[in-house]
């Protein structure tokens, strides 16, 4: 029997997958209970080893960063030279954290001044630190999380929820995204009540996928995959929920839209859900601001009134532009190890 006729729930089972599941579950469970200082260092170490030995993946990261740098330099040219205050802020930031060379309080304009090889290594190390630390953050109490994760833009979430149509949250692969399940809890500390859901792609290991899904749902999250179809996630949004969608994934098909000045097939899902539900869209980004310290930023996604919302390409471009700004705010926190362009 050909593999495409076997249900995914059966195709990704078997002894080898079970062994992988036991190992992965053991690692995740360990990361959830270890001190975050240790998991952060372990993650950076794992990232360094990956950078050292994964030569083909380094080439992928290099190509992605070259495209991002070109885009950032173009934005920098449009914005003009940095002010004296911005330059002082950049120097202060660079001296306070050696592992966050890609960040700058003055925005994105200074990023490309660092050597490309330094950027490539930092992408690997931050990817490891963000992944490992994300599991630790996901199991902390809200009070503990606030010591490590700062949220900016909650006022935009509050304003969006007041419209009564739910919220669509545009996500990119960046930062400690496993900590996203803490967003509703942290928002509640500021008087904002919201249920969080997310679109997700099932893992190629049924055992680990089921366990990880149970873990996330135990935190109150609602998870939707392609087997849930179109209506369930839209109904969730309409009921007042906030649905997170990873919108920067590489697509085989989809409307072509500019992404860092490269025309790429783009996921139509955020735009389709926005058109169907009328829910406002917010974009979320992460930035490492110090060792074991992150900033999560929420920004409203806006577009001119004359935009044709019946056009999937127009909606895809709007979403890509929002993702560009978030990723460019801290490029080394982006997960650039997949062939996006």
What are these regions (language model features)?
Residues 147-150, 205, 223-226, 263-264, ...:
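A conditional alpha-helix N-cap/helix-loop micro-motif detector
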Residues 2-88, 102-103, 107-168, 176, ...:
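Membrane-anchoring hydrophobic helices of lipid-metabolizing enzymes
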Residues 122, 130, 163-227, 252-255, ...:
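Catalytic core of membrane glycerolipid acyltransferases/transacylases, capturing the structured
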Residues 2, 6, 11, 50-53, ...:
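Non-catalytic C-terminal accessory region of glycerolipid acyltransferases
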Residues 58, 202-206, 264-267:
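Active-site metal-coordination segments of metallo-dependent hydrolases
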Residues 69, 73, 164, 188-193, ...:
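Glycine-centered loop/turn motif at secondary-structure junctions
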């Amino acid at each position: 029997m050909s593999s495409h006729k076997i249900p995914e729930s059966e195709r990704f089972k078997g002894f080898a997958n079970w062994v992988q599941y036991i190992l992965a579950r053991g690692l995740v469970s360990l990361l959830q209970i270890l001190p975050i200082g240790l998991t952060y260092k372990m993650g950076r170490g794992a990232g360094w080893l990956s950078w050292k030995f994964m030569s083909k993946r380094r080439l992928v990261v290099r190509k992605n960063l070259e495209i991002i740098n070109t885009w950032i330099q173009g934005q920098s040219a449009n914005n003009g030279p940095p002010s004296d205050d911005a330059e002082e802020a950049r120097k202060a930031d660079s001296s306070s954290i050696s592992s966050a060379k890609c960040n700058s309080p003055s925005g994105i304009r200074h990023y490309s001044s660092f050597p490309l090889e330094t950027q490539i290594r930092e992408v690997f190390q931050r990817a490891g630190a963000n992944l490992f630390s994300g599991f630790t953050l996901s199991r902390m109490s809200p009070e503990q999380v606030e010591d490590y994760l700062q949220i900016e833009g909650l006022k935009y979430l509050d304003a969006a929820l007041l419209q009564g149509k739910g919220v669509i949250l545009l996500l990119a692969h960046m930062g400690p995204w496993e900590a996203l399940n803490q967003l509703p809890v942290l928002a509640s500390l500021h008087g904002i009540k919201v249920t969080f859901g997310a679109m997700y792609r099932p893992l190629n290991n049924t055992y680990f996928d089921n366990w990880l899904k149970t873990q996330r749902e135990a935190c109150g999250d609602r998870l939707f995959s392609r087997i849930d179809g179109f209506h369930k996630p839209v109904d969730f949004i309409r009921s007042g929920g906030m649905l997170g969608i990873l919108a920067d994934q590489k697509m085989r098909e989809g409307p072509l839209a500019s992404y860092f000045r490269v025309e790429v097939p783009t996921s139509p899902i955020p735009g389709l859900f926005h058109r169907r539900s009328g829910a406002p869209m917010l974009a979320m980004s992460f930035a490492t601001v110090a060792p074991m310290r992150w900033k999560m930023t929420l920004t409203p996604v806006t577009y001119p009134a004359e935009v044709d919302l019946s056009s999937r390409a127009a909606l895809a471009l709007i979403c890509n532009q929002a993702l560009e700004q978030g990723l460019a705010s801290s490029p080394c926190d982006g997960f650039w190890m997949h062939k996006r362009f």
